[in-house]
A protein has these predicted regions:
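Iron-sulfur-associated redox domains of electron-transfer enzymes in respiratory
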Residues: 2-142
Length: 142
């Protein structure tokens, strides 16, 4: 996964960090965050897309190998947030990129993040994505 903060308040990043920590451990589900979009099959976007982050976000998407999966994490990425004014925003994420997975919340909990990513893990495996593996035991979250 490549995470791009497109202009958030960092609430979603805090929860994503918790989901990656030892208690939830995203890695046990085959998920890891990579520094380069060239090594990612999931683009995880947080925050509303600001004017200043638009080009960087689109460049990250273009650098990803096929199949490209975009996940919107949090209400701001879904166009329902309270940050910014229309003049500061490039538009809703869904108008800029094809969003596959929507994970609502302000911010979503680590459990919601993992459960929200579960469907795309199975889809990714069916499409032959190489880096994301299926969630073997979703009940492990409970």
């Amino acid at each position: 996964m490549r995470h791009v903060d497109a202009g958030s308040c960092n609430g979603c990043e805090h929860e994503l960090s918790a989901a990656s920590g030892p208690h939830y451990d995203l890695a046990r589900f085959g998920l890891s965050v990579t520094a380069s979009p060239r090594h990612a099959d999931v683009l995880l976007v947080t925050g509303p897309v600001t004017v200043h982050m638009r080009d960087a976000l689109l460049a990250a998407y273009e650098a990803m190998p096929e199949p490209r999966i975009v996940a919107a994490l949090g209400n701001c990425a879904l166009g329902r947030g309270v940050l910014g004014s229309p003049d500061n925003l490039a538009g809703p994420l869904e108008k800029l990129l094809p969003v596959t997975v929507r994970i609502p919340g302000c911010p979503p909990t680590p459990e919601q993040i993992i459960q929200g990513l579960e469907p795309l893990l199975h889809r990714s495996a069916r499409q032959g994505a190489s880096k994301v593996r299926g969630l073997e035991d979703p009940s492990a979250l409970r």
